[in-house]
Amino acid sequence: SELGIFVPMLVEAGVTSFHVTLANHSSLEDTIPPRNHPYFKDEGCFLKFCDEVRRYTDKPITGVGGLSDPDFVEEQLATGRIACAAMCRQLLADPEWPNKVAAGQCKEIHRCVRCNKKCLGGLQQHQGTHCIYEKG
């Protein structure tokens, strides 16, 4: 794996943390996968890449990829698999996610269903980034 070469070089150059994600610019669905994606359909679908980076560093790692379930996210943080959870579509679906989790209102969360209809679809159609849950 090239990670064994590049991660230590980046640490030596002064990198203090890693935000691990995936991008395939020939396929937007691989970069922002819908729930029915053949390889990336599960909660935390990119965390396996964090595990690979972890093999080469003890620096903090931010994970991303279909994170929406508060219990799942907490487990990843508590076990040290990741030091930070990054969310994009989930925060479009419910910008109050962090506040609802902190207040113990997890049942009130609008969970991202990863349909990509208004977030990615709106972006591709130059209509802005929105969510199917938005009112109005």
Where are the regions that the model predicts?
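Flavin-dependent oxidoreductase catalytic cores
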Residues: 1-136
